[in-house]
Curated annotation (Swiss-Prot):
Pfam families: Toxin_7. It comes from the Eukaryota. Keywords: Amidation, Disulfide bond, Ion channel impairing toxin, Knottin, Neurotoxin, Presynaptic neurotoxin, Secreted, Toxin, Voltage-gated sodium channel impairing toxin. This is Mu-agatoxin-Aa1c. Insecticidal neurotoxin that induces an irreversible spastic paralysis when injected into insects. Modifies presynaptic voltage-gated sodium channels (Nav), causing them to open at the normal resting potential of the nerve. This leads to spontaneous release of neurotransmitter and repetitive action potentials in motor neurons. The presence of a 'disulfide through disulfide knot' structurally defines this protein as a knottin. The modification Serine amide is found at residue 38. Signal peptide: none annotated. GO terms for molecular function: sodium channel regulator activity; toxin activity. One of its GO terms (cellular component) is host cell presynaptic membrane. Disulfide bonds join 3-19, 10-24, 18-34, 26-32. It is found in: Secreted. InterPro entries: Beta/delta-agatoxin_fam.
Length: 38
């Protein structure tokens, strides 16, 4: 499956989903973006 990396827009509920090692952060509204897990 495709995934998006650091700083890219994501959506926890419907995708696009973050690559391994990233999580979808929605703090910077209105968009969610992938951030590093570490």
């Amino acid at each position: 499956a495709d995934c998006v990396g650091d700083g890219q827009r994501c959506a926890d509920w419907a995708g696009p989903y973050c690559c391994s090692g990233y999580y979808c952060s929605c703090r910077s509204m209105p968009y969610c973006r992938c951030r590093s897990d570490s």
